[in-house]
Amino acid sequence: MLHTIGILIWIIIKIIVIVVPLLISVAYLTYAERKVIGYIQVRIGPNRVGLKGLLQPFADLLKLITKEIIVPTRSNKYLFVIAPLFALVPSLVGWAVIPFQEGVVLANINAGVLYLFAMSSLGVYGVLIAGWASNSKYAMFGALRSTAQTVSYEIAMGFALVGVLLAAGSMNLTDIVNSQKGGMLHWWFIPLLPLFLVFWISGIAETNRAPFDLAEGESEIVAGFHVEYSGIGFALFFLSEYASMILISTVLAILFMGGWLSPFEGITFLDQIFFIVPGFVWLLLKISFFLFVYLWVRATFPRYRYDQLMRLGWKVLIPVTIVWLIVTAVMVVAHVKPWF
C-alpha cells in the first residue's frame, strides 16, 4: 500500500515538474512573439510592465481571469463551457511520453510516436465543439475550416512519421533519439529532408498558425471558432495553441534533430569543449530554434486562401511524402551509410 502511494506521489511530482515549466514557457512565448514580431516590424513591443516588459504575460493573465465569461443566449451552454478543455488537454497530455534526456521521461512507452500522433489529432474536437456550440456562423465556419485542415495535413504528417519509424526501426522516442548518435551528420533530417520539411509545415498547419490560420481568419470571419469566447475560455484556447506549438517543436527536435544529443559528437576538439553542456540544454536550444521560426513565419507570410491550403496539403505534401517513403525504404534495404 505504502509502495503504491509512493509511486503515485512520484508520478504527481513528475507531472508538476513538466506542467509548471510548460505553462511558464507558454506565458513567455506570448511575450517573445510580441517582441520578435515587433522587432521585425521595427516596433518596440511590450515594455511597460516590469523590466523590459517581462511581467506582461502575468498582466495579460490577470486581465483574462478577471473578465466576465459571457455565454451566448442560444448556445449549447454545457458544450460551450467544456470545449476549451477539449482543446487544451491533448496539448498537455502529449508531454507524458516526451524524453527530455536519457531516462528523464514520465512514461517511456514503446508506442510513443503513435500516442503523440493520437493526442495531436484530438485537439480538433475542442475547436469543432466550440464552433458548433457557439451558435454563430463565424464560429461554425472557423470550426469546419479547422477540421478540414487538420484532416488534410495529418495524412502528410502521418506519412512523415512512418519515414522516421522506417529509419529508426522503433516507435519508442528514446530509441529514435539514440538511433541518431554520432553527431549532426547522423541526424535524420539529412536523409529524410523532404519528410522533415513536410512534418514541419504540417505542424504549423496543425496548430492553426499563420500562414495557415484559416480557422481564425481575423480579416474574414472575425476570430473564427473562438469569436464568442471571453475571459478564461479564450485564455484556455490561447494556452492550447501555444502549448501545441511547443509540443510540435519538441517532437521535431526529437524525431529529426537528435533530441538531447550534442551536434558535436564525433568532432573531438569540439566535443571536449561542449561535453559539460547537459542534454536537456541542447533540446531546449533546438526547441527555441523551431519556435523562433514559428514566429518568423507569422510575421513574414500572408494567409493562404482556403483553396491554396487544400491544394498544398493534398497535391504537394502527400505525394512528396509517399515518394520519399519509397526512397527511404530503398535506403534502409541498401544500408546507405552513415545512417542505415
Curated annotation (Swiss-Prot):
Membrane-protein topology: Multi-pass membrane protein
Stored HAMAP family: NDH1_NuoH (MF_01350)
Quaternary assembly: NDH-1 is composed of 14 different subunits. Subunits NuoA, H, J, K, L, M, N constitute the membrane sector of the complex.
Catalytic activity reported: a quinone + NADH + 5 H(+)(in) = a quinol + NAD(+) + 4 H(+)(out)
Gene symbol of the encoding locus: nuoH
Enzyme category, top tier: translocase
Keyword field contains Chloroplast: no
Record bears the keyword Translocase: yes
Protein name per the record: NADH-quinone oxidoreductase subunit H
Superkingdom of source: Bacteria
GO molecular function: NADH dehydrogenase activity; oxidoreductase activity, acting on NAD(P)H, quinone or similar compound as acceptor; quinone binding
PANTHER family: NADH DEHYDROGENASE SUBUNIT 1, NADH-UBIQUINONE OXIDOREDUCTASE CHAIN 1
Entry keyword set: Cell inner membrane, Cell membrane, Membrane, NAD, Quinone, Translocase, Transmembrane, Transmembrane helix, Ubiquinone
TM region(s), chain numbering: 4-24, 78-98, 113-133, 151-171, 184-204, 244-264, 273-293, 316-336
GO cellular component: plasma membrane
Family from the record: Belongs to the complex I subunit 1 family.
Function description: NDH-1 shuttles electrons from NADH, via FMN and iron-sulfur (Fe-S) centers, to quinones in the respiratory chain. The immediate electron acceptor for the enzyme in this species is believed to be ubiquinone. Couples the redox reaction to proton translocation (for every two electrons transferred, four hydrogen ions are translocated across the cytoplasmic membrane), and thus conserves the redox energy in a proton gradient. This subunit may bind ubiquinone.
EC number, as in UniProt: 7.1.1.-
InterPro entries found in the cross-reference section: NADH_UbQ_OxRdtase_su1/FPO, NADH_UbQ_OxRdtase_su1_CS
UniProt subcellular location: Cell inner membrane
Annotated organism of origin: Legionella pneumophila (strain Lens)
GO biological process: one example: aerobic respiration
